[in-house]
């Protein structure tokens, strides 16, 4: 290396040019190529190429179907679609929110509390634990939970060996025409979690949770590498002209892009009518289940009418490297975010 004044100036110039190139137009393109390399067709696990390890590849699936109001039929459909996802190479399979029956929250009816079951001894969870072990897949299982005198909209996280890794209870509970969940569900008390499964550390939010960026960020801060959102969203009974499906997708695409993690959303399809205290309420569910990549791009998308199984593969090591390169977690300023702990935006 040159050591005189001229040599030092030359070295400094070269260093600055390299730095400029790193910050300029070429760098985002390189990052985008890195992310795109992390998305592919399903296979799962680590693979060897030319004798070397190429990354931790995980295949995820979202399934969607129309629910009847017969629990056994819906659980059988969920199992059939999970098996189909497994045949397509999926390691983690997401089924929609409260898939055991119709979305009963359209009405406020005391008899619907009979649908709630404890987590322990829950026949649907036990059945899907056996399936998870048989297929070696991870299954987040949505269900209406009874816990003594409390009731929750919950997900049990079943690992690939059938182990129940624990619960997440829905934190944000909506209350509006057709979506009267506050009548049935206590606000969740688990907090946001990251679950370490055989294939990846995952975060799971439930439906209305998906509208809150704090939920996604909290899970990723705890190490979640993929976000999952079981959902029940459709038309608004009070306004037939209101269609939020594109807004719904864009919000979650933002979570994926802001946190540089893949995201999986599973929604039901079909038209469901529920007897209410004042007559009937009907919702047509949007479907549009999707899988987003770590820059927010949709890589798989279902329509609004058909039963579907979506599968996509991601290289989590590649994505992790890209996430580090962007520095979004390095440059966070938690000391400035105290206002997020308030409702009115006023610092105490």
Residue ranges and their predicted role:
Residues 60, 157-165, 290-299:
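Short, glycine-anchored, charge-dense loop/turn motifs used at functional sites
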Residues 49, 76-93, 214-221:
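Short amphipathic alpha-helices and their capping/turn segments at secondary-structure boundaries
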Residues 117-139, 207-309:
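CN hydrolase (nitrilase-like) catalytic-core segments centered on the catalytic cysteine
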Residues 141-143, 154-157, 193, 289-291, ...:
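Short beta-strand scaffold segments in enzyme catalytic cores
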Residues 27-38, 46:
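Intrinsically disordered, glycine-rich low-complexity segments
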Residues 3-6, 18, 38, 44-45, ...:
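C-terminal beta-strand edge segments of enzyme domains
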Residues 51-60, 194-203, 226:
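Beta-strand-turn-beta hairpins that frame and shape the catalytic cleft
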Residues 2-3, 71, 80-171, 176, ...:
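Cys-nucleophile CN-hydrolase/nitrilase-fold catalytic domain and related Cys-dependent amidase chemistry
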């Amino acid at each position: 290396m040159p050591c005189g004044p001229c040599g030092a100036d030359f070295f400094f110039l070269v260093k600055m040019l390299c730095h400029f190139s790193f910050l300029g137009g070429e760098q985002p393109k390189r990052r985008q190529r890195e992310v795109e390399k992390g998305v592919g067709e399903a296979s799962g696990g680590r693979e060897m190429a030319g004798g070397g390890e190429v990354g931790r590849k995980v295949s995820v699936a979202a399934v969607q179907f129309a629910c009847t109001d017969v629990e056994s039929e819906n659980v059988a459909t969920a199992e059939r679609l999970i098996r189909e996802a497994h045949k397509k190479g999926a390691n983690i399979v997401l089924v929609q929110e409260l898939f055991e029956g119709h979305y009963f929250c359209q009405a406020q009816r005391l008899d619907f509390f009979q649908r709630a079951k404890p987590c322990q001894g829950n026949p649907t969870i036990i059945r899907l634990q056996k399936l998870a072990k048989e297929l070696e897949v991870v299954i987040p299982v949505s269900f209406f939970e009874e816990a003594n005198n409390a009731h929750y909209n919950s997900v049990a996280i079943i690992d690939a060996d059938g182990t129940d890794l624990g619960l997440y209870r829905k934190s944000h509970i909506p209350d509006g025409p057709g979506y009267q969940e506050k009548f049935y569900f206590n606000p969740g008390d688990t907090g946001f979690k990251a679950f370490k499964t055989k294939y990846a550390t995952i975060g799971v939010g439930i439906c209305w949770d998906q509208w809150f960026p704090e939920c996604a960020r909290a899970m990723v801060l705890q190490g979640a590498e993929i976000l999952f959102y079981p959902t029940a969203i459709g038309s608004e009974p009070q306004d037939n002209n209101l269609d939020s499906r594109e807004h719904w997708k864009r919000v979650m695409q933002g979570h994926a892009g802001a946190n540089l993690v893949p995201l999986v959303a599973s929604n039901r399809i079909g038209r469901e009518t529920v007897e209410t205290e004042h007559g009937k309420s009907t919702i047509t569910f949007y479907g549009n289940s999707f899988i987003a990549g770590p820059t927010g791009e949709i890589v798989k998308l279902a329509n609004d009418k058909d039963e579907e199984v979506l599968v996509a593969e991601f290289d989590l090591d590649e994505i992790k490297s890209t996430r580090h390169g962007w520095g979004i977690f390095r440059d966070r300023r938690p000391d400035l975010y105290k206002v997020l702990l308030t409702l009115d935006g006023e610092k105490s």
